[in-house]
């Protein structure tokens, strides 16, 4: 599960294990069924949801997406980092389209559960499962 907030705190977006990308209005804490349309002009303060048009290229062809454990966008909006079940941290340009070639780095013996860019995007941190 992941949650992102917009820069003006009007909207929140979330995803879950049921592969749903949901949008919520912060003023009344209600789900917005038209959120995909209503949030087109919105700038997101964070980028951690693993479903959406800007992350569609993180899933290799022929996979169901369950191996991607976490996504994190850089603060400058240029990069996406993913952690997966194979111990890899994969770095993509943001937005990530299908057929974009990422850079993959092995740093864990087990699955990578989360990635996080430092405040100035100079460092990328990753958290492993059972390392």
Q: What name fits each language-model region?
A:
Residues 1-131:
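WD40-repeat beta-propeller superdomains and closely related acidic/aromatic-rich repeat-like regions
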């Amino acid at each position: 599960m992941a949650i992102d907030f917009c820069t003006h705190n009007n909207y929140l977006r979330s995803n879950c294990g049921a592969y749903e990308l949901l949008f919520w209005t912060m003023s009344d804490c209600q789900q917005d069924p038209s959120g995909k349309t209503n949030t087109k002009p919105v700038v997101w303060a964070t980028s951690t949801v693993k479903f959406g048009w800007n992350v569609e290229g993180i899933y290799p062809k022929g996979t169901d997406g369950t191996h991607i454990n976490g996504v994190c966008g850089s603060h400058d909006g240029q990069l996406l980092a993913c952690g997966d079940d194979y111990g890899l941290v994969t770095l993509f340009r943001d937005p990530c389209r299908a057929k974009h070639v990422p850079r993959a780095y092995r740093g864990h013996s087990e699955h990578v559960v989360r990635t996080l860019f430092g405040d100035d995007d100079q460092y990328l941190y990753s958290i492993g499962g059972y390392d």
